[in-house]
Every structure is written in C-alpha cells, then in structure tokens.
C-alpha cells in the first residue's frame, strides 16, 4: 500500500528525531484533519514523503495545567510535521522543499494557522528557512500563548538535548480561527524547565479571524 511505502521511507531515511512511538496513520481518503502521510511520486515511484498531524502531543501541556479549552484550540490551530524524507537517489532536486510547502498547504486547507517542525541538522534548518519558516537557535524553547476567556495561557516547550543541533521552526500559514495566539522563544533553566515570563521574546501575535 502507498501508506506503507511512505511510512517505510520515513523510518529508513530520518536519522534523528523519528518518534517510533507514533502509530502509523491509517489511510485518510476523506482528507480529514488527523495524522496523515503525504507522498511525492515521480513516474509511479515514491521519491519523498512526510508525516503531518494535529499537534496533540504538545497540546497535553495545556491540559496538564487545566486549560482544556486552550489545549483544544492549540491542537486545532497547530500542525506538526513529524518528519520529511527524500529518497537518497533524489536528493538535491528540491523535492524536500516542495514537500514542506505541500505540508503548509495541507495545514492551511484544514484551518490550522501554524505549522511546527523540528530540524535536527543545519541542512534541514536551511531547508526550513527556504520554505519561509522562522528557525529558532538550537536548544531554545518554543513558547505559545493561547487566549482563553480573555486570559493568556503560556506553555513553553524545551528542545531535548539528545540531538545537539535540534531546534524549533514554525511557519504562519493563515490567521487563527480558533483562539488568539502568540509564538515566542526563551531559554529554559533548571531541571524542571523553568522560565521567566519576562524573558520570552514574542515573535508573532494575532487575533482570530473576524
């Protein structure tokens, strides 16, 4: 099946950052906003692929502090690219960049407004920049504020140190539809991942569509 081919390519080609705990998405013939595999084909051969999904994993940070409405708005607004891969014999052909843009389009068509990605090396970071992403420095936390009942709720997501070059990248693909959002960055300190609200450098802020 095509889904198996895309899944196997991602598992084989992604050296760092592939989350093996994630289940393989089922086929999505109705194109719903749920975990989805995207394949790039040339002459009936798979040349690249991507795995996109609502960012349900990071939404749990809002749920953990009792902000259920903010968690729902975050998950509905933020699309996570879990991985992009290109077949070895088709690298340096611009396929990865085209796949990234396809992921952005998929997110926007499903009413998400932010696409998140985690480049794990300098080459991947450059590709994200070419695709229009804001790329944070390595090991810097991504901070997201979701407005819930006129109260801004902030969660910061540190970057694990297992892969030193890992960094957050984000791209604004539409105006928020579910809740006002802001995105920023900060350095988190201590074993508990503490941060100072005043130390967050906000980079993007937008209200919902009228």
Name what the model sees in each region.
Residues 141-210:
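C-terminal "cap" of GNAT-fold acetyltransferases
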Residues 20-21, 27-41, 45-83, 145-152, ...:
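Conserved acyl-donor/pantetheine-binding loop and adjacent beta-alpha core of acyl/acetyltransferases
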Residues 86, 92-105, 130:
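Conserved acetyl-CoA-binding loop-helix of GNAT-fold acetyltransferases
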């Amino acid at each position: 099946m095509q889904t198996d081919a895309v899944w196997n390519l991602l598992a084989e080609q992604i050296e760092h950052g592939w989350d093996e705990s994630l289940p393989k998405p089922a086929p999505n013939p109705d194109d719903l906003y749920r975990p989805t595999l995207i394949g790039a084909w040339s002459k009936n051969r798979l040349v690249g692929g991507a795995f996109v999904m609502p960012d349900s994993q990071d939404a749990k940070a809002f749920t953990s502090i009792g902000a259920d409405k903010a968690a729902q708005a975050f998950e509905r607004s933020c699309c996570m690219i879990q991985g992009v891969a290109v077949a070895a014999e088709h690298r340096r052909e611009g396929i990865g960049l085209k796949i990234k843009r396809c992921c952005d389009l998929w997110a926007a068509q499903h009413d998400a407004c932010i696409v998140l990605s985690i480049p794990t090396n300098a080459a991947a970071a450059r590709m994200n920049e070419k695709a229009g992403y804001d790329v944070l420095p390595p090991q810097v936390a991504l901070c997201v504020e979701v407005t819930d009942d006129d109260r801004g709720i902030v969660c910061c997501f540190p970057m694990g140190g297992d892969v030193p070059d890992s960094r957050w990248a984000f791209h604004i693909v539409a105006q928020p539809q579910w809740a006002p959002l802001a995105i920023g960055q900060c350095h988190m300190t201590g074993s508990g991942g503490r941060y100072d609200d005043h130390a967050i450098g906000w980079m993007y802020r937008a209200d919902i569509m009228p």
